Structure formats: C-alpha cells, structure tokens
Design a protein with these regions (language model features):
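Generic hydrophobic, amphipathic alpha-helix propensity
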Residues: 6-14, 31, 56-60, 64, ...
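N-terminal intrinsically disordered/low-complexity leader segments
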Residues: 1-5
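Amphipathic, non-transmembrane alpha-helical scaffold segments
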Residues: 11, 57, 61, 120-131, ...
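Hydrophobic alpha-helical connector segments
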Residues: 55, 70-101, 153-160
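C-terminal peripheral helix-coil segments that are non-catalytic and often amphipathic
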Residues: 85-93, 128-144, 154, 158, ...
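Amphipathic alpha-helical segments used for helix-helix packing
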Residues: 82, 97-118
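Helix-turn-helix
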Residues: 9, 17-51, 55
C-alpha cells in the first residue's frame, strides 16, 4: 500500500470516528482497524493523537473550503443563489445520515475548544475563513442589489455562520433537517429579503 493511500485511509477513518463518537471517545486502535493498517503506520505519519486530530480537521476544512470556493465564487450564478446552493449541498450531506453526525468543525469546537488551545485556535481559523467567504459572497450580493446596502456584510456573515452552526447542532439533536429549513426560510425570506 502506498504511503499516501495509507495516510488517506487513516485520515478518513479518523474523520468517520470523530463524527460518530467524538474526538475523546475515538481510540487509535479502532481507527487503525477501520483503516485496515498496522499500528506502526500511525506513528509514521502522526506524532500523537492531537497531531492526528488536527490533520483530520485540516483535511476536512480543506474539503469544505474547496466546495465553498466552487459554490460561493461561481460568478455565473447570482450571489444569493450561490449561498442557497451551498446550504443545499450541506443540507443534503447532513440528511444522508439522518442528521446524526453534524459538522466536524462544530462538533470539535464544542468538544475541544476548552481542552486544547491548539485545537481552539485552529477551529477559530477555520470558522474565520468561512466567514470571509460568506462575507465576500454577501458583498457581491449587496453590489448586485440583492441585499440592503445598509447591512454590514461582515456582521451578517458572522450571524450567518453562528446561526447555521446552531441549526446544524439542532438538526443533529432532533435528527431532522427541520432546523436547517427554518434557518433558510428566515435568512432568505426575512433577513436577506429586506432591501432599501
């Protein structure tokens, strides 16, 4: 098995375990079994569990960032439609497992932000990168006349992230996409629809 494939298998098994059980309840042994690789392979790629967890988080953030770039930066689509399409993609992914897993970044924020400063700082960087992308798209919507010029797009992007993460958490708790639909209805039907 190639080195790249082995590392990828470990990272994917880690993501699966963290989403299903959380970071603290995920054991290296069970991750190795899931990946089908020997124990020595783990320490070849990762210094310890925290290093592994951060690499899993980085891989997840990289994948989400790529999806955000594709969906939120496609200037052939109106800005608000891009945001709606992005939320639709995330909603579909969450519904595919009956909303049981939630968002890895949100989950790890709740679990690790007060346990590891390294995790907390990295999670905040990821959230800030998401806010940056939302704000850029919302600014384009504002320029296009889709959003009120009176709104502070950075503040709106922060509100978007905070509200969306809350909706994802509630969807996980309820095992229902209803909170996601409520978020979209209120955001697009009330907050973003007010133009001056």
């Amino acid at each position: 098995m190639s080195k790249v494939k082995t590392k990828d298998l470990l990272l994917e098994a880690g993501k699966k375990s963290f989403l299903e059980k959380g970071y603290n309840n995920s054991g290296i042994e069970s991750i190795l079994q899931e990946a089908g690789v020997p124990k020595g392979s783990f320490y070849h790629y990762f210094e310890n569990k925290e290093d592994f967890g951060l690499k899993v988080l980085d891989r997840f953030a990289e994948c989400i960032g790529e999806r955000q770039e594709v969906l939120l930066c496609d200037e052939s689509v109106p800005p608000l439609e891009r945001l709606r399409n992005y939320c639709g993609m995330v909603s579909d992914a969450l519904r595919s497992d009956e909303c049981r897993k939630g968002c890895l970044v949100g989950n790890l924020s709740q679990e690790m932000a007060d346990q590891s400063e390294v995790f907390r700082a990295r999670l905040e960087e990821i959230f800030e990168s998401w806010v940056d992308r939302y704000a850029a798209c919302l600014k384009q919507a504002q320029v296009a006349g889709e959003v009120s010029p009176d709104l502070d797009v950075r503040e709106l992007a922060e509100f978007w992230l905070n509200s969306w993460q809350g909706a994802v958490l509630r969807a996980k708790t309820m095992r229902s996409p209803a909170p996601l639909h409520t978020f979209l209805d209120v955001m697009f039907g009330n907050i973003l629809s007010v133009r001056r």
